[in-house]
């Protein structure tokens, strides 16, 4: 008897955040598909789920326009290698996880070969470079969005889209507790803690590290009782941050931990972070925060004129109003950031902010992995098992 060939699902995650999303979707799909293969580009979490990565995820890591331009020949060769593989052995569906500039070009080529394409995590077309929506319409059979306003945007432009919620909203409890976590990091219940997250890439640490260190120095002078905890995403970033720290700020008392950014935020009273997923996590953990971000000069010159939204921090975007202070580029200066952090540290009542964070959390809590898997199965035309 001839064995039915396995369902082939190709995926590309270009960053570790996409690796986490991909792992959750793979885990859920395996509940419905007993004979399935996953291949493409993924990180350690996807590999744990049985994913076969043709290329190491680190080879796709870029930060800013200048890095993309410098690495373009390498990225081009990687893309062509993947497309050759999938031309010879076509997958039943391709799922691009975030990483839009790379994945959309792959999706466009595969769709011309009549391969179903899904994009998980909307490119920020609602924020900048809105003309990309026309490329997305041609390249993608379905966009799976993590936020409700994204689904509405795509449908207005005739693109098939579905809001699935955010996996982090499913993972983090509505009313998180951190009392036992404080003991893990040798803090007391009455200690005042500021969690500082300068970024998860070398380029981000390069711009945000010195700025946030200077803010910590100011706060240490004005509020000597405040404790600082800085999670560093991976070992590769340690030399970069330690060089900045010991250049001028070696006297600062900072607890530096590897990974565990969520725990660092959970035990804190206030979070200081660059923009990005960390702002969402801080909101889901119900932590007051200050958000800042700086680009390189070239990246800022290209991107800034195309930005179409009033905010960069996800809590503000999701609320449709300014819930938390945010500072971008020239406004991301030591004086402004320090003042905002001190105001939050001195505030004794954040009940209204926490209520609004909770309302958004409930909206995003949709069992995202299951919704994504069911949408993928519908595209595949596979009956549920």
UniProtKB/Swiss-Prot annotation:
One of its GO terms (biological process) is lipid A biosynthetic process. Pathway: Bacterial outer membrane biogenesis; LPS lipid A biosynthesis. Coiled coil: none annotated. GO terms for molecular function: lipid-A-disaccharide synthase activity; phospholipid binding. Belongs to the LpxB family. HAMAP family: LpxB. Condensation of UDP-2,3-diacylglucosamine and 2,3-diacylglucosamine-1-phosphate to form lipid A disaccharide, a precursor of lipid A, a phosphorylated glycolipid that anchors the lipopolysaccharide to the outer membrane of the cell. This is Lipid-A-disaccharide synthase 2. The lineage of its organism: Bacteria, Pseudomonadati, Pseudomonadota, Gammaproteobacteria, Legionellales. The gene is lpxB2.
């Amino acid at each position: 008897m001839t064995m039915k060939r396995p369902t082939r699902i190709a995926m590309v995650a270009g960053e570790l955040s996409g690796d986490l999303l991909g792992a959750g979707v793979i885990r859920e799909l395996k509940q419905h598909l007993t004979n399935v293969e996953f291949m493409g580009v993924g990180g350690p979490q996807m590999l744990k789920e049985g994913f076969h990565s043709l290329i190491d995820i680190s080879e796709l890591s870029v930060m800013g326009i200048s890095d993309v331009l410098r690495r373009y020949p390498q990225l081009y060769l990687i893309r062509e290698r993947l497309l050759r593989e999938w031309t010879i052995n076509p997958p039943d569906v391709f799922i691009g996880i975030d990483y839009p500039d790379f994945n959309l070009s792959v999706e466009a080529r595969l769709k011309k070969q009549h391969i179903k394409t899904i994009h998980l995590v909307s490119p920020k077309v609602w924020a900048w470079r809105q003309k990309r929506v026309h490329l997305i319409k041609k390249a993608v059979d379905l966009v799976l969005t993590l936020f409700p306003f994204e689904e509405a945007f795509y449908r207005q432009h005739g693109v098939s889209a579905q809001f699935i919620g955010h996996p982090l909203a499913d993972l983090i409890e509505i009313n998180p507790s951190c009392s036992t976590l404080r003991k893990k990091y040798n803090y007391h219940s009455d200690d005042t803690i500021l969690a500082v997250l300068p970024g998860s890439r070398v380029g981000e640490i390069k711009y945000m590290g010195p700025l946030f260190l200077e803010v910590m120095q100011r706060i240490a002078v004005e509020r000597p009782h405040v404790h600082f905890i800085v999670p560093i995403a991976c070992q590769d970033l340690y030399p970069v941050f330690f060089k900045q720290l010991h250049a001028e700020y070696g006297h600062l008392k900072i607890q530096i931990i590897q990974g565990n950014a969520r725990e660092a935020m959970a035990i804190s009273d206030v979070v200081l972070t660059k923009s990005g997923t960390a702002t969402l996590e801080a909101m889901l953990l119900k932590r007051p925060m200050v958000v800042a971000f700086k680009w390189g000069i070239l990246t800022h010159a290209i991107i800034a004129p195309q930005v179409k939204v009033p905010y960069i921090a996800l809590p503000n975007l999701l609320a449709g109003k300014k819930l938390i202070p945010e500072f971008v580029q020239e406004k991301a200066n030591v004086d402004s950031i320090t003042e905002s952090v001190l105001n939050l540290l001195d505030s004794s009542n954040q009940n209204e902010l926490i209520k609004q964070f909770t309302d958004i959390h409930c909206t995003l809590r949709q069992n995202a992995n299951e919704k994504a898997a069911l949408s993928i199965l519908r595209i595949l035309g596979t009956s549920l098992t």
